[in-house]
Amino acid sequence: MTGVQTCALPIYLKEYYSTLEEARADLVAMWNFFDPKLIEIGAIPNIEVAKAAYDSEARAALAQLHEFPSGDTIEEDHRRGTQLIVNFIRDKTGAIQPVERDGKVYLVVKDYDEMRKGVGMLLAELMRIKAEGDYDAAKALISKYGIHFNTAWRDQVVQRYKSLDLPSFWCGINPDLLPGNSPTDIRIVYPRDMVKQQLRYVVITGR
């Protein structure tokens, strides 16, 4: 075969491809957070950073529900990916559990080791699905864990956000990472404003 080769995975995984990729990207980071090599090279100061990342993922699955004030389904791929990760880990390991305090529900990490096992389990399955182009497995997994949510929790979260007077959506500017003379010598720069960033995404994704 000659010339530029293109990936055919979106053809096989169809409407579930983007959700799978969003979840897979997060899972790779979540798995590597607990690698002691990160502390060794100075990427993180201690293991508490990894624990905070796991706490943030659990919290995000609940907090993001304020973006869906009606209905009981999620269409956006990154939000589906977060629900997929947290709901899968809750179901398979019990490492994340709902806790009620002062009449408010929270999703709390009870066991970080078990959560990492769940991260590994789901990452392995998503990698298998991607490698085999297993559409039926992607559909079943995302339909079970990534699309539907607890509407009572959503209603509570919406009210909590209203009391904080926070915006429903926000946008961030992503940096470029410029390499230096060593693997840990990275310079962070912000060369684009929001408009240029979004136009760049259109060029990359074609949409």
Feature annotation, model-predicted:
Residues 99-207:
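Non-catalytic terminal regions of proteins
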Residues 11-23, 45, 49, 53:
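Alpha-helix capping and helix-loop boundary segments enriched in small/acidic/polar residues
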Residues 30-129:
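Long, well-structured alpha-helical subdomains associated
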Residues 3, 7-9:
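Short, small-residue-biased leader/transition segments that mark boundaries at the very start
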Residues 17-35:
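An active-site-proximal "capping" alpha-helix that borders the catalytic cofactor pocket
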Residues 5, 15, 48, 64, ...:
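Residue-identity detector for glutamine
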